[in-house]
A protein has these predicted regions:
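Active-site signature of alpha/beta-hydrolase-fold catalytic machinery across serine-
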Residues: 161-165
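Extended, Lys/Arg-enriched charged tracts that mediate electrostatic binding to polyanionic substrates
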Residues: 26-80
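Charged, compositionally biased non-catalytic regions
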Residues: 1-44
Length: 395
């Protein structure tokens, strides 16, 4: 049973975009792939993204609340393997491509994932909109030896959920391939997801903002595993999220290798590296993946130093979105008041966060929960704005 090559995986990840854009029919789109997989219009899956699921039955609200209704669009394709992939299937899920899709990422909250842990509610809702169609397509084919789940952007998040579901529901052998995918769930999700999939190939560009969100406590799978870093960029760049060959650099271009061992890998151990930031060094920070990771590590170090990590992690699993940052901000206010050492540590963290978000300060005297929450909102807002721009630029 073969693994998809980087080149083949990236080409397959691009197919749903071409279907979505109406570029020819699937037989023509996949002509260069016909040696390995057969695709057809009948194996196209419609999915709903964006909006608020409970409002699907109230069309009148489409006019009243712009973006509240979810849209149904060509969202995924299924390919039947041949040759070295005989008796295997591939499921390729596209990312978001319009503003309406992006409200999915603001469906703040958690839901139970197929692997029994907690994941992003918006991603779960989107996956649930295609699950029944996946079941129907699977019932039409004989039991596959393996299923390859592939996706870019939001499609990578859904491919991860799909892989977990296929393992839980059918006990199929599953490989997962993602390009520029966001974090899907909390720590336990990442651990279980990494343990369930037979192989995970997580591909990123250094400047792609989408894999940087959602922020901790969301964690990438495989937990403490590795990613395939396909370029050498460091600063956040909107174009770094592009899938297409005319992108800069474009995942189709950077994943053109025929073997995975030809690509650079990078370990994801930063969350477990102790980091204590000093306020006087804040201007070293920049809007980059390196500093996004370092700031997350500094926050976790602070919570470990104050014996709060277990408490905060538990609260993350039961409190949604901004409510979690309310709780976290109150914890940090108490920490700052506890001792001069902790006050210095909190101030250093906040100073670096503000510089990261493009809001440098000369001094920080206000250490209230209200101010700390505003700092979190500033950082989150900056990352989401840039990630949204990157998503809207995808073509």
């Amino acid at each position: 049973m073969a693994t998809l090559t980087p080149k083949l995986a990236s080409q397959i990840a691009n197919i749903p975009y071409m279907v979505y854009q109406g570029i020819g029919d699937l037989e023509l789109i996949s002509k260069s792939l016909t040696r390995h997989f057969s695709f057809s219009e009948s194996a196209t899956i419609q999915g709903k993204t964006g909006g608020i699921p409970v409002l699907d039955s109230v069309p009148l609200l489409r006019k009243v609340i712009p973006g509240a209704m979810r849209t149904s669009e060509a969202f995924a394709v299924i390919g039947i393997g041949k040759g070295v992939y005989q008796d295997e299937l591939v499921v390729s899920i596209r990312g978001t491509q319009n503003a309406n899709d992006w409200i999915t990422n603001f469906n703040i909250g958690y839901k139970g994932a197929p692997n029994g842990s907690i994941a992003h509610a918006g991603f779960i809702n989107s996956f649930n909109s295609i699950k029944n169609q996946l079941k129907q397509h699977l019932s039409k084919n004989r039991t596959p030896k393996k299923i390859h789940c592939v996706g870019h952007s939001l499609g990578g998040a859904l491919a991860s959920l799909c892989a977990d579901w296929l393992k839980s529901e059918y006990s199929y052998r599953v490989n997962l391939y993602t390009f520029g995918a966001p974090r899907v769930g909390l720590e336990q999700y990442a651990i279980k997801s990494g343990n369930r999939a037979d192989k995970i190939f997580r591909c990123t560009h250094g400047g792609d903002p989408v894999p940087m969100i959602p922020l901790w406590p969301f964690v990438h799978a495989p937990y403490q595993g590795q990613e395939y870093r396909l370029d050498s960029s460091t600063k956040v760049c909107i174009s770094a999220h592009a899938m297409s060959a005319d992108g800069n650099p474009g995942y189709l271009n950077t994943a053109s290798a025929e073997e995975w061992r030809a690509l650079k890998t990078r370990a994801n151990q930063y969350l477990h590296t102790p980091v204590r930031l000093k306020f006087e060094h804040r201007n070293q920070a920049s809007f980059s993946e390196y500093w996004a990771n370092k700031i997350s590590a500094a926050l976790i170090t602070l919570l470990k130093d104050t014996l709060l990590l277990a408490t905060v992690t538990a609260q993350a699993a039961i409190s949604s979105g901004l409510t979690f940052y309310d709780l976290l901000s109150r914890h940090l206010e108490k920490v700052a008041k506890a001792s001069k050492v902790r006050e210095i540590q909190v101030r250093g963290l906040l100073g670096h966060m503000l510089v990261f978000a493009g809001k440098p300060v000369i001094a920080i005297e206000d250490m209230t929960a209200s101010f700390i929450r505003k700092v979190f909102e500033t950082v989150i807002g900056k990352l989401y704005r840039v990630a949204k721009q990157a998503i809207l630029a995808v073509r």
